């Protein structure tokens, strides 16, 4: 069957009242980004649904692009015919023949919003159903639990027919809740945190700390590949790669071993927060899970968070590791995350890090080093790349060129 469009039904957008238009616009933008390799498609958004006009594009490829996009409750491959009963009959028969299995069951579910069509909803159900039955001997009607449900939507602009409903990713369109910076390591937790933030409409920009020669190019590429996995939910993710070697070396030389990790995380957070400010972000997202490691106790979080007043969103904070792993497997980041390339969070890790660091002592230790200058230098040399849904990354520019 040759489908000519995809019919998209909204999720939580239906509850957004006066803000509905901006949600629909954001969803349309995300769909367009996801369809960059299908330039022939056209997107038409309405108040209660959206259409993707395929113009000859492969509907199965379009279907795969739509599945991960947040803000879509469900969607259906569909065909449009003129407001003519005979055309509706022909299209209905072709759709059911394509979708049914031997000795299967079906039902017709019609809705008529265009009152000038000669049949009302019940008459459409009866006439189209009878026509299909007359032309398919091995088919029977089951109105409660059919194998094939033929939906017919009669509108002023035409009649739309479909036989299959595919569940979407639900949630809110990415970007509808503002922008945040995702602290993206090469581990399991932070990509899951990024995924969950996107599901609630947050546009993420990834921040990755790279410390050559202690961390390899493979570790950097792994982080880029993880960002590409997240890009499929919005079409594109901006990624900022921070040169962090010098700061880590100074921390190792100047800071007591037991609090190296606390100070390291504080410097990461300061850099991320400055990036957030320059990029007009509203929050910082990370993959911290309470009590999982020494830097993720409440006492450690308090000492680390003291460097900023920016909201820190921790989507996985209450999850067990197995729960996080299950989501990582679902979104296809787990196998990447467990690749054995060391990232900057694991180098220089002391054997017995403090789990209850004191903020006043941390600030005292830091006072002997000009970390402001080191942070400014790192910010001046950030590399920014654009990671898109097709899992390609291109160097966009140096960070200084953005401002």
UniProtKB/Swiss-Prot annotation:
The keyword RNA-binding applies. It is found in: Cytoplasm. ATP binds at residues 183-184, 208-209, 265, 287, 296. Its EC number is 2.8.1.4. One of its GO terms (molecular function) is ATP binding. Pfam families: ThiI, ThiI_fer, THUMP. Residues 60-165 form the THUMP domain. One of its GO terms (biological process) is thiamine biosynthetic process. GO terms for cellular component: cytosol. InterPro entries: Rossmann-like_a/b/a_fold (IPR014729), ThiI_AANH (IPR020536), ThiI_fer (IPR054173), ThiI_N (IPR049961), THUMP_dom (IPR004114), THUMP_ThiI (IPR049962), tRNA_STrfase (IPR003720), tRNA_sulfurtransferase_ThiI (IPR050102). Its main location: cytoplasm. Keywords: ATP-binding, Cytoplasm, Nucleotide-binding, RNA-binding, Thiamine biosynthesis, Transferase, tRNA-binding. Pathway: Cofactor biosynthesis; thiamine diphosphate biosynthesis. It comes from the Bacteria. PANTHER family: TRNA SULFURTRANSFERASE. Belongs to the ThiI family. Catalyzes the ATP-dependent transfer of a sulfur to tRNA to produce 4-thiouridine in position 8 of tRNAs, which functions as a near-UV photosensor. Also catalyzes the transfer of sulfur to the sulfur carrier protein ThiS, forming ThiS-thiocarboxylate. This is a step in the synthesis of thiazole, in the thiamine biosynthesis pathway. The sulfur is donated as persulfide by IscS. NCBIfam families: tRNA uracil 4-sulfurtransferase ThiI. This is Probable tRNA sulfurtransferase. It comes from Listeria monocytogenes serovar 1/2a (strain ATCC BAA-679 / EGD-e). The gene is thiI.
């Amino acid at each position: 069957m040759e489908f000519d469009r995809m019919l998209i039904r909204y999720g939580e957008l239906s509850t957004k009242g006066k803000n509905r238009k901006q949600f629909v616009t954001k969803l349309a933008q995300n769909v367009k980004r996801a369809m960059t390799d299908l330039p022939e498609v056209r997107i038409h958004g309405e108040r209660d649904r959206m259409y993707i006009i395929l113009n000859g594009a492969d509907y199965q490829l379009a279907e795969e692009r739509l599945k991960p996009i947040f803000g879509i409750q469900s969607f259906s491959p569909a065909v449009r015919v003129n407001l003519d009963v005979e055309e509706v009959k022909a299209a209905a028969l072709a759709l059911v023949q394509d979708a049914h299995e031997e000795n299967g069951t079906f039902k017709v579910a019609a809705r008529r919003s265009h009152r000038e069509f000669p049949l009302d909803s019940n008459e459409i159900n009866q006439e189209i159903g009878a026509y299909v039955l007359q032309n398919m001997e091995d088919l029977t009607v089951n109105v409660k639990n059919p194998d094939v449900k033929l939906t017919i939507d009669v509108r002023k602009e035409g009649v739309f027919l479909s036989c299959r409903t595919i569940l979407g990713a639900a949630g809110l369109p990415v970007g509808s809740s503002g922008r945040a910076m995702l602290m993206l390591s090469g581990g399991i937790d932070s990509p899951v945190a990024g995924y969950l933030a996107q599901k609630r409409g947050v546009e993420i920009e990834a921040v990755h700390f790279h410390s050559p020669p202690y961390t390899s190019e493979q570790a950097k590429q792994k982080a880029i590949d993880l960002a590409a996995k997240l890009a499929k939910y919005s079409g594109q993710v901006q990624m900022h790669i921070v040169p962090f070697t010098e700061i880590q070396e100074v921390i190792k030389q100047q800071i007591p071993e037991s609090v190296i990790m606390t100070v390291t995380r504080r410097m990461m957070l300061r850099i991320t927060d400055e990036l957030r400010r320059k990029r007009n972000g509203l929050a910082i997202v990370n993959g911290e899970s309470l009590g999982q490691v020494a830097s993720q106790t409440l006492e450690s979080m308090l000492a680390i968070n003291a460097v900023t007043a920016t909201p820190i969103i921790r989507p996985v904070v209450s999850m067990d590791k197995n729960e996080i792993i299950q989501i990582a497997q679902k979104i296809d980041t787990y196998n990447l995350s467990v690749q054995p390339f060391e990232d900057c969070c694991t180098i220089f890790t002391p054997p017995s890090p403090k789990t209850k660091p004191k903020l006043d002592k941390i600030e005292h230790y830091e006072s002997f080093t000009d970390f402001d200058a080191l942070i400014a230098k790192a910010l001046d040399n950030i590399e920014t790349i654009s990671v898109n849904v097709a899992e390609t990354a291109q160097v966009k520019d140096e960070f200084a060129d953005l401002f």
